């Protein structure tokens, strides 16, 4: 009896200590919903229209909201100036990632750049990515981006499956740069395989309900007893097999590509093949889906806001004329077109919140943010902030005209900004400028009735939004522009080996 009593006292004391310690941590967080059930705050966000739930938290508690995320203390940021303070001025301690055991350890073998904590490995792999994704390097990709966008215009003349056309565009561009070969058709089996891998990975890795992320000790449960672990290991094996196969082919192509570029870098002798899989593969996984979804939003904005389309087309007609397609070199003279793309990114943010983690205790605005707390940057709130944006619910490209250097929050802030932001922005700009130059955008009609578009209809995948399918009518602006597209495509050089070799020489010369 005495032993049982002693055990009970120890157990109760331990529970009290854990409760008191946890309460002390949460009492010093910013105001917010306090956790009664262990996972309550995060579960409250698992509902449709999560952006409304996040906005409600800021309306109730202010720009800094204390909450839980997988049982861990978390802070939700709703103001851009606060995010710039923490991720910029205090970036040395706010540039890590919340530990996602499923996404990093199990599904990617500890090497996915996006999920890596701030430290030596992340710095090493990020430096490698920067050698071919920095702003000067990306400018050398313009001829290839123009070829792929021209191909996409040709596809749009014959297909109303815009998602497939846009997916092929960015996938082929990335595939050509990474592995030295293009994807010529939206029905290419390689594209289907890549899309399936990327979609499954993003959906699973960013899922907010893996118990192993809340209880990391579950990582050590044998796979035979854990279906979720077998699932993650299967995705890992499929991803490594797919991308290692592509790397092997890339090393024997005739032209320059990212694989050969990384192999030739002097400081990459210690980089493993497994790390290379994710140095390159993570760019594909993160970029293709977001670019595709953003271009679908672009079409939606064009249909719903014809006055903005007219202003952009007037600018294109003045600068470019009707006898040739716009190029990326024209963009310096197309401020409204650039503003149009930025407004698409702000108008309907596709990333609800980006997750960071703090590596040491910090005091900010009178609150204590504990070490390893999850820091969520609420990009939706920042892009819809009425104190920053006049009538933020309206689509108004002119709001970007006064400061062309200003960038939307879609690419993040601080040291964990999207590594591919420059390439992504140029892809969006070349596609948007050429579609605005070439096409009219109207509602579809069915049975004599106009088919309406709901601009708030999204599929929600954890903290990512994907526009639901909608119908639109896209037609050439006039027969002359149709002829320009077709004749330019017929005359275009389709062999990309000379293009890639030229890119390689220019990047090598610039870095020498």
From Swiss-Prot:
Pathway in which the depicted protein is active: Secondary metabolite biosynthesis; terpenoid biosynthesis
Induction cue: Expression is regulated by the secondary metabolite regulator cclA.
Class in the EC hierarchy, top level: oxidoreductase
Keywords: Heme, Iron, Metal-binding, Monooxygenase, Oxidoreductase, Signal
Ligand binding (heme): 418
InterPro entries, per the entry: Cyt_P450, Cyt_P450_CS, Cyt_P450_E_grp-I, Cyt_P450_sf, Cytochrome_P450_fung
Cofactor: heme
Signal peptide: 1-23
BP GO terms, sorted: terpenoid biosynthetic process
Any one GO MF annotation of this record: heme binding
Gene ablation phenotype (knockout): Impairs the production of trihydroxy confertifolin and deacetyl astellolides A and B.
Enzyme Commission number(s) from the entry: 1.-.-.-
Role of this protein: Cytochrome P450 monooxygenase; part of the gene cluster that mediates the biosynthesis of astellolides, drimane-type sesquiterpene esters that show antimicrobial, anti-inflammatory, and anti-tumor activities. The first step in astellolide biosynthesis is performed by the sesquiterpene cyclase astC that catalyzes the formation of drimanyl pyrophosphate from farnesyl pyrophosphate. Drimanyl pyrophosphate is then dephosphorylated by the sesquiterpene phosphatase astI to produce drimanyl monophosphate which is further dephosphorylated to drim-8-ene-11-ol by atsK.
Protein name as it appears in the record: Cytochrome P450 monooxygenase astB
Source lineage: Eukaryota, Fungi, Dikarya, Ascomycota, Pezizomycotina
Gene name of this polypeptide: astB
